[in-house]
């Protein structure tokens, strides 16, 4: 596999996907510190919002320490070369949120839907293109759909005006062959000028391998996070990705040592717990469960005595997807009742 001479855009997730393990409680000072470090390291694109995107502040997803407006207006003026992106999930974020982000200086908007529901993105993608934004269609939980199905969804988003399509391994479930099959099919179906991206999670330790597989079949935008800070076992660790790319001759424009220092000196100290592949994060990848479900499952374990691993396996069996966070507690309660019927003791917290 020779990828020498290829150029990719590394897109940072530390300040957006990294909000999940922080329970959306990053301070403005932490945002400023990490963002300026990433900018100085040469990272060209940095995503900044609530973990669930613009408008994510809610009972269902969690209330952040600050509003999206505060985070964006704090970070954007400090950037010397990096551009700032925002995530938007139709049904959570609105056109008004999109306009707010544009007015604050967000250059890239990523409109995210479940991998079978691209049709709900039409209004937001069309509006973003009308405003002249770099507009990305972001197909989540892509392991749950065939390559042929993803092609149809990607073509819809491209037709609405998206100039880049992302195939997103939200559960960290895919293996390199899965990535190649899906992304190569989508790459062949899209217009040559439409860019292709990949967003990975490290639940099966496949973040780097999957990202390289994506580049091999034509992806030129790759998501990663410093020290892997993100949902589950985290995103593809950026400092490792950049070092591997340097070894392989893939051009990222990111300084190998500066991004290591950002990860080690700025991101690791702000972690509330180590981002690693523990048994529950591994279960996310093994069972194909949405990454941000992890902390919800751990909280349900503490409350109802149902092991998080067993709960995650059940959520995977039921095919739960992002947006169904409220069903995690419901599923835990159902499992408690079923066990009590069978005479099993379940320790429910008062």
UniProtKB/Swiss-Prot annotation:
PROSITE patterns registered for this protein in UniProt: PYR_CT (PS50991)
E.C. number(s) listed in UniProt: 4.1.3.39
Keyword Zinc applies: no
The keyword Chloroplast belongs to this UniProt entry's keyword annotation: no
Keywords of the record: Aromatic hydrocarbons catabolism, Lyase, Manganese, Metal-binding
Record-annotated Pyruvate carboxyltransferase domain positions: 8-260
A Pfam family per the record: HMGL-like
GO biological process: catabolic process; L-leucine biosynthetic process
Residues that hold substrate according to the record: 16-17, 170, 199, 290
Catalytic residues identified in the record: 20 (proton acceptor)
GO molecular function: 2-isopropylmalate synthase activity; 4-hydroxy-2-oxovalerate aldolase activity; manganese ion binding
Reaction equations catalysed: (S)-4-hydroxy-2-oxopentanoate = acetaldehyde + pyruvate
Site feature location: Transition state stabilizer: 16
Residues annotated for Mn(2+) binding in this entry: 17, 199, 201
Superkingdom, taxonomy of origin: Bacteria
Entry similarity comment: Belongs to the 4-hydroxy-2-oxovalerate aldolase family.
HAMAP family tied to this protein: HOA
NCBIfam families: 4OH_2_O_val_ald (TIGR03217), PRK08195.1 (NF006049)
Name under which the protein is recorded: 4-hydroxy-2-oxovalerate aldolase 2
